[in-house]
């Protein structure tokens, strides 16, 4: 399907329901799908979503609550250090999770290809939280966060915003929740989001390696 036709179909797709289903996850297709605002959610079958409205966060608009300041420098940050362990932790800390073995295998492949990335938080060399997602152009497509210690996922988002601020990124948060709103995320229309992707996904990120953003 041509890009213009897919764009038109997505504008008229269900606002709060899957756009289509697939039996499997394929790394190459995921990369293409993300550039059109699609993401997988649930498995067997895989459901693909492009919700309207869409929740995004602009890094320089991050809200840092006063009670968070004491946590910001409490944990050690590592980038792309143990992606596989982080995504597995995201699965294992949820009673019900769409992150099954196929998801982990496919996203780890995307990690080895340089698309998927992780920001991990450690305390005494123990992984206690983080966030992972895809970077395409100047968009960080957030997939999942995890927090073992208090406020670890919030710290991860704050640190991610700090790292991406100089590069004019947006962060796709997919679906609104109050936790994200408190941090500065907001909803925009699907049409506006898809137009942003047209521009941002075709730009250079501004850095060579995500893991080198901290030393």
From Swiss-Prot:
Gene Ontology cellular component list: cytoplasm
A Pfam family the protein falls into: Leu_Phe_trans
Reaction catalyzed: N-terminal L-lysyl-[protein] + L-leucyl-tRNA(Leu) = N-terminal L-leucyl-L-lysyl-[protein] + tRNA(Leu) + H(+); N-terminal L-arginyl-[protein] + L-leucyl-tRNA(Leu) = N-terminal L-leucyl-L-arginyl-[protein] + tRNA(Leu) + H(+); L-phenylalanyl-tRNA(Phe) + an N-terminal L-alpha-aminoacyl-[protein] = an N-terminal L-phenylalanyl-L-alpha-aminoacyl-[protein] + tRNA(Phe)
Gene Ontology MF terms: leucyl-tRNA--protein transferase activity
Subcellular localization, as worded in the UniProt entry: Cytoplasm
Gene3D superfamilies for this protein: Leucyl/phenylalanyl-tRNA-protein transferase, C-terminal domain, Leucyl/phenylalanyl-tRNA-protein transferase, N-terminal domain
Record function comment: Functions in the N-end rule pathway of protein degradation where it conjugates Leu, Phe and, less efficiently, Met from aminoacyl-tRNAs to the N-termini of proteins containing an N-terminal arginine or lysine.
Family of this protein: Belongs to the L/F-transferase family.
Name of the protein in question: Leucyl/phenylalanyl-tRNA--protein transferase
């Amino acid at each position: 399907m041509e890009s213009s036709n897919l764009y038109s179909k997505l504008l008229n797709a269900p606002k709060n329901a899957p756009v289509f289903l697939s039996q499997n996850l394929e790394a190459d297709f995921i990369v293409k799908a993300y550039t059109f605002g699609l993401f997988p959610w649930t498995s067997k079958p895989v459901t693909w979503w492009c919700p309207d409205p869409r929740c995004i966060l602009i890094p320089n608009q991050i809200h840092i609550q006063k009670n968070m300041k004491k946590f910001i420098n409490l944990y050690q940050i590592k980038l792309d250090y143990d992606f596989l362990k982080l995504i597995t932790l995201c699965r294992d800390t949820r009673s019900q999770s769409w992150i099954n073995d196929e998801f982990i295998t496919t996203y780890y492949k995307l990690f080895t290809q340089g698309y998927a990335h992780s920001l991990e938080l450690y305390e005494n060399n123990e992984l206690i939280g983080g966030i992972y997602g895809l970077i395409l152009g100047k968009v960080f497509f957030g997939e999942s966060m995890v927090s073992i210690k208090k406020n670890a996922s919030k710290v991860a988002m704050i640190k991610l915003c700090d790292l991406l601020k100089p590069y004019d990124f947006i962060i796709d948060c997919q679906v609104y929740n109050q936790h994200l709103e408190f941090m500065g995320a907001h909803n925009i229309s699907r049409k506006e989001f898809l137009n942003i992707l047209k521009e941002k996904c075709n730009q250079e990120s501004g850095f060579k390696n995500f893991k080198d953003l901290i030393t």
